Amino acid sequence: MASYKERSESHTSPVARRLFSIMEEKKSNLCASLDITETEKLLSILDTIGPYICLVKTHIDIVSDFTYEGTVLPLKELAKKHNFMIFEDRKFADIGNTVKNQYKSGVFRIAEWADITNAHGVTGAGIVSGLKEAAQETTSEPRGLLMLAELSSKGSLAYGEYTEKTVEIAKSDKEFVIGFIAQHDMGGREEGFDWIIMTPGVGLDDKGDALGQQYRTVDEVVKTGTDIIIVGRGLYGQGRDPIEQAKRYQQAGWNAYLNRFK
């Protein structure tokens, strides 16, 4: 298993290279998932935990007071200030031409500011080319795509043949598709792919919620191939102190990563 540093030097995607460099520099494989509906609160929490994360995962369409100038521009400033990247968890799932417009147009203009986004494989490989075209037409900055191979929710249909087919779609573009949302390693190294595995549903304290979320521990997911742990309510839910929890998850994630090499 290659180190983050080695992967930052060898990866085919500039987005992945930068992400691995940040992870190595900050000693963090923590992605903060902030499902927060008010801009001020979103930015405030992000500013406090920014030093401890490599990535923030947003759901920009739940921000009720969203404006491009008031939400996106300060978000980008915080990413610059604290040296983390931005992942908009849009989960595109339509035909190529439609997702192309969803990605670059509308009120959110995701392709302009999100380093990384993600998509379901359900509509086939056209989704990858549609999103890539949108990125190329929108910005000169590099963009990366994650495919949703597996989900952490109870009763998810994303497993088995569906997961295998999604992996095949990912192989259609080595530079733009940088990895997967998945629960374990997706292989591919023998064919020259170096996929980043990001795993949601990671918690040190909770086992799940009433809406079907199932949590796994940091050690458990990193041991099975996760590169980046995605933590949401574990950082700020139930009256938790975001700074204290961000430090805790950063340390747990980094220690689990170092244990890979023992």
UniProtKB/Swiss-Prot annotation:
SUPFAM superfamilies in the record: Ribulose-phoshate binding barrel
Pathway: Pyrimidine metabolism; UMP biosynthesis via de novo pathway; UMP from orotate: step 2/2
UniProt cross-references to InterPro entries, sorted A to Z: Aldolase_TIM, OMPdecase, OMPdecase_AS, OMPdeCOase_dom, RibuloseP-bd_barrel
The keyword DNA repair belongs to this UniProt entry's keyword annotation: no
Active site: 91
Annotated signal peptide: none
A Gene Ontology molecular function term of the record: orotidine-5'-phosphate decarboxylase activity
Chain positions recorded as substrate binding sites: 35, 57-59, 89-98, 215, 233
SMART domains tied to this protein: OMPdecase
Keyword annotations: Decarboxylase, Lyase, Pyrimidine biosynthesis
This protein's record includes keyword NAD: no
Enzyme's top EC category: lyase
Cross-referenced NCBIfam families: pyrF
Name assigned to this protein: Orotidine 5'-phosphate decarboxylase
Protein source organism: Pichia kudriavzevii (Yeast)
Lineage of the organism: Eukaryota, Fungi, Dikarya, Ascomycota, Saccharomycotina
Gene: URA3
